[in-house]
Amino acid sequence: MNKNDLRVIKTKKGIHEALLRLLNKKPLTQIKVTELCKEATINRGTFYFHYEEVGDVFSEFFEEIIQDLKASYDEPYKVLGKDNFSVHRLDPNMVRIFHHIKKYEGFYKIVFSNNVSSNYYYMLFDEIRANLTSDENNHHQIITNNFFYSYQANAIIGMIIEWYRNGFQESAEEMNVYLMEIVKFKV
């Protein structure tokens, strides 16, 4: 079966959604294949046709989210071009990170809840930091780059956490404006 087959896409989406529901109740390590199959309303044969274990489902779903996050981060560069990029030329409408968060809100609610391991947080931190590190336009003359990238990644995550604590009440567009105001703020 082709991975672009609509049946495969729908089945995997259902499994991903079932995994999210279960992750709201317990850690990944405690979720069994049988339990996931029941939640996704599929049989074990269908599960094993696509995956070997529950961790594979999480890895695939996390990779999908990270690819979308990377695409969201890169969006302003597509509009302005890597050579012409400047924070001062950046319009809040070009920022897509918060649209990404809204799209995967269920996942981020789990990542930032107090009920789960901080491993998810650090996985997300590492991915955001990797995006910042690979950005040729993102460097600081005085501060060691590792500290600079970690500061920026935590600043973005801090905004996302605050948004989460507010129940994602603000729109992605509002969050974009807040981010741009913070980025352009000079002490």
Language-model region placement:
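Amphipathic alpha-helical segments used for helix-helix packing
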Residues: 95-123, 161
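Basic, helix-initiating cap at the start of DNA-binding domains
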Residues: 1-26
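Amphipathic alpha-helical packing segments from all-alpha helical-bundle domains
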Residues: 114-139, 143-150
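Alpha-helical structural segments
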Residues: 17-21, 39, 56-76, 92, ...
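Helix-turn-helix
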Residues: 25-55
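Hydrophobic alpha-helical connector segments
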Residues: 74-103
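Basic, amphipathic alpha-helical hairpins
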Residues: 20-28, 104-105, 135-137, 186
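Hydrophobic/aromatic-rich alpha-helical bundle segments in the mid-to-C-terminal region
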Residues: 135-182
